[in-house]
């Protein structure tokens, strides 16, 4: 298995969202886990497991 993480700002980032969508469309995804991160900046952390 391989892993990749994405950090999506809660305020939105079209480029980051597009990067995530392209990655998901072009890889064999095993699982996706999301967690909301409330630190200095608010964001969604997306953890992708793929083959």
Specify the residue positions occupied by each region the protein language model found:
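A short, exposed loop/beta-hairpin motif centered on an aromatic-Gly-Thr core
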Residues: 1-14
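Sequence-level motif detector for i,i+2 pairs with an aromatic at +2
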Residues: 1-3, 27, 43
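Intrinsic disorder/low-complexity segments enriched in polar/small residues
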Residues: 3-5, 18-19, 50
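Hydrophobic beta-strand residues in large extracellular and virion-surface proteins
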Residues: 6, 29-32, 46-48
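A short, charged, amphipathic alpha-helix used as a generic interaction element across diverse proteins
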Residues: 13-35
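C-terminal edge-of-domain segments
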Residues: 40-51
